[in-house]
Regions:
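Surface-exposed coil/turn segments at beta-strand junctions on protein surfaces, enriched
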Residues: 78, 91-93
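N-terminal onset of structured domains
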Residues: 1-56, 64-68, 86-89, 113-117, ...
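Short, surface-exposed secondary-structure junctions/capping segments
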Residues: 78, 131-140
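Aromatic sugar-binding surface patches on proteins
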Residues: 76-84
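Internal, hydrophobic beta-strand segments that form the core of beta-sheet-rich folds
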Residues: 93-112, 117
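Short amphipathic alpha-helical surface micro-motifs
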Residues: 31-32, 65-67, 79-80, 101-105
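Solvent-exposed serine/threonine-rich low-complexity stretches and specific carbohydrate-binding patches
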Residues: 62-76
Length: 161
């Protein structure tokens, strides 16, 4: 991985628990910010999600949904903004982590710039429905302006989950 040019963090985290085969109620949202001035040849930033084992040391299978997204802001695709992944589904029971990698495309190809792992997601049949907390609701309303296809109607639906 190249030197750090960006920070990547979860703005809306994956749930702590989910049911196998059912999509997460809310999308996972990542925040991307440059550290200093990114390399001039970066043309586009993309995040992609994969599933890891509980320790985060090995790949796991069973993640499906919209696994890639462009980094966007109010002005379109940018070097600083947000990316929305989802709906995401984990097909089998177990304990996993979501790994999200930030990649930069340039005329020279694509390179991974950063990655972040979620906390453990316990996938089991008895998992409660994921409902946004009041803090998440407030944050989701702020994100409606960020060109991520999140609407007040979506937020209301997630609150009723």
């Amino acid at each position: 991985m190249a030197g750090r040019e960006f920070t990547l963090s979860f703005d809306i985290t994956p749930p702590a628990a989910a049911r196998p085969g059912l999509p997460f109620t809310m999308p996972v949202v990542l925040a991307v910010k440059p550290i200093g001035t990114p390399a001039q040849n970066v043309q586009h930033l993309v995040v992609s999600a994969s599933l890891r084992d509980e320790a985060g040391t090995g790949a796991a299978v069973g993640l499906s949904g919209s696994l890639t997204a462009s980094v966007r802001s109010r002005t379109g695709n940018t070097m600083s903004g947000y990316a929305k992944l989802g709906p995401l589904t984990i097909s089998q029971p177990g304990k996993f982590r979501l790994r999200v990698m930030l990649s930069a495309a340039s005329v020279n190809g694509v390179i991974t710039k950063e990655y972040v792992d979620s906390t453990v997601i316990h996938v089991h049949a008895g998992a409660a429905a994921q409902r946004p907390t009041p803090t998440q609701v407030a944050r989701l309303h702020q994100l409606t302006a960020e060109n991520l296809d999140i609407s007040p109607a979506d937020i209301a639906t997630w609150q009723r989950a």
